[in-house]
């Protein structure tokens, strides 16, 4: 897609790639940061962006749960995206730790950070 690396998909000035390999949340974030300059686990800033990535994960890769860049490791700190984006759009479940995006219903689900899941990297074009 325009401005993105090969095999990446573009949406509103950002590039995305779903990785089927499973990693812990921290390892997935490290992978995204090392893969491309400005890369992070994806932030989701609107319902439409969430639907876009759900389609990529579910329809193209047959993946239901993917790590996203939202975490609440210390619980005394506010929730934050790994890329520094503001948390203007929320689709939270009850008890935040790390989060996966669930592709069928476009919802975020708390998940144990040390479990291994597929993930989505995102960077600005």
UniProtKB/Swiss-Prot annotation:
Annotated C-type lectin domain residues: 11-122
GO CC entries: extracellular region
Keyword Secreted among record annotations: yes
PROSITE patterns, A to Z: C_TYPE_LECTIN_2
InterPro entries registered for this protein in UniProt: C-type_lectin-like, C-type_lectin-like/link_sf, C-type_lectin/snaclec_domain, CTDL_fold
Disulfide feature: 4-15, 32-121, 98-113
SMART domains membership: CLECT (SM00034)
Family of the protein in this entry: Belongs to the snaclec family.
Name assigned to this protein: Snaclec bitiscetin subunit beta
Organism annotation: Bitis arietans (African puff adder)
Taxonomy of the source species: Eukaryota, Metazoa, Chordata, Craniata, Vertebrata
């Amino acid at each position: 897609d325009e401005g993105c690396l090969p095999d990446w998909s573009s949406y509103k000035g950002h590039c995305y790639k779903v990785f089927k390999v499973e990693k812990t949340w921290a390892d997935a974030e490290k992978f995204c940061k090392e893969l491309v300059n400005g890369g992070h686990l994806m932030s989701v800033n609107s319902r439409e962006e969430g639907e876009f990535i759900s389609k990529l994960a579910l329809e193209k890769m047959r993946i239901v749960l993917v790590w996203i860049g939202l975490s609440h490791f210390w619980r005394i700190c506010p929730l934050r995206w790994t890329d520094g984006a503001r948390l203007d759009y929320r689709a939270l479940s009850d008890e935040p730790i790390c989060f996966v995006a669930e592709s069928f219903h476009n919802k975020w689900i708390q998940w144990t950070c040390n479990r291994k899941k597929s993930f989505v990297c995102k960077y600005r074009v």
